[in-house]
């Protein structure tokens, strides 16, 4: 299977969920083997240089996955766009933005899916590389845990736990095996969510300044405040899977393995990536030149190109 990038550049505008700032974002094609990079067009000189994404640049995980470079350049809330890039198997892209945060759009990854559909996807000449999990790797922190296990495909299983009546109406656990299920149908529409009682605390820390009922599910003491209700009965846990897929794609390759989590979040997801990369016996970087060898979970990627 070959690496892929966008067929053309494409732009969108929106608002940062936490910064509240208006953002203009452009996705560009990028050369093979260049990976996913970001560039702040509102910054000059070294501060405005391209940032090649790696798990080691995720240095702020308060409510999102945020790049913080050693020069202090920030690119916040990257998990939703990374989740969409993962769904389309985009290996190489440059993402330019003129503010410190990716726009939240409607709180899901679906607007970014539409953006990628409009741009189109093309194969490149180099072979796509996958990160294959070779042995179990687990992180446990304060009653939470995440783990990778070997698996011939890509499967995600997550369980959430919130002491609130709205979460008792659906299963706290969701599992999706991408060999038989579609990311776009099952995951992409799930929106981020938050609680009314947390708004004052968040805004005191300059977080959630752009949040509203158009880009998040808002929950009061008893119910969902959004008049349209939920997009899935179990939208909350599905959104956590959307986040996890984006967090995991920060490693730069599709993952051949199973990911499981209990009360997972951005910090522990990133810690798991770092733990895997720190143990050379835990993973291998593999290629599938023959499509017959490609795990079924990735076959759908073969139909999402326009060249």
UniProtKB/Swiss-Prot annotation:
It holds the Pfam family LpxC. The active site is at residue 266. Keywords: Hydrolase, Lipid A biosynthesis, Lipid biosynthesis, Lipid metabolism, Metal-binding, Zinc. It catalyses: a UDP-3-O-[(3R)-3-hydroxyacyl]-N-acetyl-alpha-D-glucosamine + H2O = a UDP-3-O-[(3R)-3-hydroxyacyl]-alpha-D-glucosamine + acetate. It is an enzyme of class 3 (hydrolase). Its cofactor is Zn(2+). GO terms for cellular component: membrane. Zn(2+) binds at residues 80, 239, 243. Its EC number is 3.5.1.108. GO terms for molecular function: metal ion binding; UDP-3-O-acyl-N-acetylglucosamine deacetylase activity. Pathway: Glycolipid biosynthesis; lipid IV(A) biosynthesis; lipid IV(A) from (3R)-3-hydroxytetradecanoyl-[acyl-carrier-protein] and UDP-N-acetyl-alpha-D-glucosamine: step 2/6. GO terms for biological process: lipid A biosynthetic process. Belongs to the LpxC family. Catalyzes the hydrolysis of UDP-3-O-myristoyl-N-acetylglucosamine to form UDP-3-O-myristoylglucosamine and acetate, the committed step in lipid A biosynthesis. This is UDP-3-O-acyl-N-acetylglucosamine deacetylase. The gene is lpxC.
